[in-house]
């Protein structure tokens, strides 16, 4: 782990894109805040620019949540083929993509279309996981929470079979986090019970995407991402006690990295 931590100190100053650009596709009326949490976590992990693509109705609240986020709206409330085209355009700008946080009622074909038409590393999260199982996942890290891994077990029987057949990497958080990749199973034991609070899954997605956008390979990004989330949760718990929320964890990410 020390080897991975040291890579975070190698921040170049050659240009304004050296630390990567992350695109975030997510959000809905039911879950409006997820894209902002993902974006803030990515920025705190070192990403230079984050652009979120959200339904038109969410543009104002997401844009107003942080002046550090770039926000693009798509027409309507449902992520459909037209919105997918917007996402593909943004991915031309980005170094890594997160798709799925809060993405309620998205068209499955639209999610698959984005994955098939982009060639950057991608974090597939939450409601994008099930439709993504029919896509090429050789560039993907999956970050399911709770029962979101159910479709994986249903389709493949085990995480090992899933990763070996698809080439994907998967991070499962819990009392001990598990990172599964082709031929390997890793564990991370950082963290506290505070990380069961809402929004920490979005935080993990943002951290992982930031590392991917900084050109870390998928297994290392998944492993270090889980470690950063856990350590940040420990710092937040020490500072705030039992009332920790996801934004507290996000604000502790720079301390963890230092």
From Swiss-Prot:
<feature type="binding site">
    <location>
        <position position="201"/>
    </location>
    <ligand>
        <name>AMP</name>
    </ligand>
</feature>
<dbReference type="Pfam" id="PF01256">
    <property type="entry name" value="Carb_kinase"/>
</dbReference>
<keyword id="KW-0521">NADP</keyword>
<keyword id="KW-0547">Nucleotide-binding</keyword>
<keyword id="KW-0456">Lyase</keyword>
<dbReference type="GO" id="GO:0110051">
    <property type="term" value="P:metabolite repair"/>
</dbReference>
<keyword id="KW-0520">NAD</keyword>
<comment type="similarity">
    <text>Belongs to the NnrD/CARKD family.</text>
</comment>
<keyword id="KW-0067">ATP-binding</keyword>
<dbReference type="GO" id="GO:0005524">
    <property type="term" value="F:ATP binding"/>
</dbReference>
<feature type="domain" description="YjeF C-terminal">
    <location>
        <begin position="1"/>
        <end position="258"/>
    </location>
</feature>
<protein>
    <recommendedName>
        <fullName>ADP-dependent (S)-NAD(P)H-hydrate dehydratase</fullName>
        <ecNumber>4.2.1.136</ecNumber>
    </recommendedName>
</protein>
<comment type="subunit">
    <text>Homotetramer.</text>
</comment>
<dbReference type="InterPro" id="IPR029056">
    <property type="entry name" value="Ribokinase-like"/>
</dbReference>
<dbReference type="GO" id="GO:0052855">
    <property type="term" value="F:ADP-dependent NAD(P)H-hydrate dehydratase activity"/>
</dbReference>
<comment type="function">
    <text>Catalyzes the dehydration of the S-form of NAD(P)HX at the expense of ADP, which is converted to AMP. Together with NAD(P)HX epimerase, which catalyzes the epimerization of the S- and R-forms, the enzyme allows the repair of both epimers of NAD(P)HX, a damaged form of NAD(P)H that is a result of enzymatic or heat-dependent hydration.</text>
</comment>
<feature type="binding site">
    <location>
        <position position="202"/>
    </location>
    <ligand>
        <name>(6S)-NADPHX</name>
    </ligand>
</feature>
<dbReference type="InterPro" id="IPR000631">
    <property type="entry name" value="CARKD"/>
</dbReference>
<dbReference type="GO" id="GO:0046496">
    <property type="term" value="P:nicotinamide nucleotide metabolic process"/>
</dbReference>
């Amino acid at each position: 782990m020390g080897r991975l931590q040291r890579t975070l100190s190698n921040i170049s100053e050659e240009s304004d894109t050296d630390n990567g650009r992350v695109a975030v596709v997510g959000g809905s009326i039911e879950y409006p805040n997820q894209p902002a949490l993902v974006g803030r976590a990515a920025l705190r992990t070192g990403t230079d620019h984050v652009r979120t693509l959200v339904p038109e109705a969410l543009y104002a609240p997401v844009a107003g949540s942080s002046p550090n986020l770039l926000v693009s709206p798509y027409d309507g409330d449902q992520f459909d083929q037209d919105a997918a085209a917007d996402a593909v355009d943004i991915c031309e700008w980005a170094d890594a993509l997160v798709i799925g946080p809060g993405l309620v009622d998205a068209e499955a074909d639209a999610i698959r279309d984005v994955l098939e038409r982009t060639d950057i590393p991608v974090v597939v999260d939450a409601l994008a996981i099930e439709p993504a199982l029919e896509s090429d996942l050789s560039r993907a890290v999956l970050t399911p929470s709770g029962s979101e891994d159910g479709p994986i077990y249903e389709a493949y029987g085990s995480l090992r079979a899933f990763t070996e057949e698809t080439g994907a990497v998967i991070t499962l958080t819990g009392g001990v986090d598990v990172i599964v990749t082709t031929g390997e199973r890793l564990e991370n034991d950082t963290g506290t019970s505070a990380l069961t609070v809402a929004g920490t899954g979005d935080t993990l997605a943002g951290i992982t995407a930031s590392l991917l956008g900084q050109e870390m390979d998928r297994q290392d990004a998944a492993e270090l991402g889980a470690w950063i989330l856990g350590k940040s949760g420990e710092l937040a718990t020490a500072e705030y006690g039992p009332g920790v929320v996801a934004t507290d964890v996000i604000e502790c990410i720079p301390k963890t990295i230092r």
